[in-house]
Amino acid sequence: PEGNFDKIYQETGYNTSDFYRRLWWPEMLNNGEKYNVKYTGLIIESYGDQVKGPFKPLDNGAARNSLIAYGRELLKAGGELGIHGYNHQSLAPAGYGQDKLGYATWESQADMEESLRELKRYIEDVYPGYEIHAYVPPSNILSPEGKAAVKNVFTDIKVYSSLWEGLATAKEYFQNFQLNSDGTSEIPRASSGYAPSQEEIWEAYNVLNYNGVFSHFVHPDEIFYEESENLTWAIMKQGMTDLLSELQNRFGWLEPVTATEAYEKLQDYVQMDYSLTRSKEGIKINASNFQKPLTFILRTDKEIGSVTGGSAKRIQANAYVLTMTDGDFEIKWAGEE
């Protein structure tokens, strides 16, 4: 974002672009390093409402320079670049509730694909040869035509990431964690915002306890939203610090991953086979059909003496994280070795 926003200027003394460069982005990078978080950043070329071609290249050198600067720093920090769209007009025809959001509607899948081809050109010009694997739909609205358009233009796409849950009457795109027959996947975001409510955090922890995933989303421009009217930058900054600090304290065993790395984890989660054998001496796990190290949570009152085929890390008085690097994994209890 550019220009001046009174709310930001009055609190920080910075214009909008300097606020993001000098305060917001350093805070994001610091949080990533301090709390062991990886980011997947989503690219958008225009905030216009055009839904009919021709889609002209963005005539904004400052925006292009920002994509270069922020993108390179994101990649350097171990992150990943994905896409949000040519613009913020959800890829859907009429009937998906866009009128309530003030969005334009697309007449055809061909128009959607034409806009995405311009986005692809825009990215290729800045990051030649970079493969795009992740897509997040604007306002969490995505039609079958829009989904097909993304896949047709960005043929390396692996992850569609929208919402985990919501109202049954909503027109948003809700997902479960799954692999699709075309080689793509559904990896929803379970929570969002810089200062989520306790209810939202509780819902995110429910997902985490369900399948071991914490997936959170923030908009850089959230401070501009009507819903953020009573939120200052200081409140939002502290809210994110509190969220990540609590996450690290409670679930410090979580492994940070980008969208593509999450896709690889999901592949193993769905496709791997394993068997478990218990004995007085310990536990044996035999697994197959996996590419990356597997992670299990083991709850036991017993003390682990030795491990072969991987590692074990105590995370609570009666719980361990098991990391399996070999198809044959064995634990022996202390005193039974």
Task: Pin down the residues of each PLM region.
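Catalytic grooves of carbohydrate-active enzymes
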Residues: 1, 32, 125-126, 132-134, ...
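The substrate-binding groove and active-site-proximal loops of carbohydrate-active enzymes
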Residues: 2-21, 51-62, 101-110, 131-138, ...
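His/Asp/Glu-enriched short active-site or ligand-binding loop at hydrolase and phosphoryl-transfer sites
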Residues: 151-195, 257-258
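Short, well-ordered beta-strand segments enriched in hydrophobic/aromatic residues
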Residues: 276-290
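Surface-exposed beta-strand/loop patches in extracellular or lumenal glycoproteins
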Residues: 286-303, 331
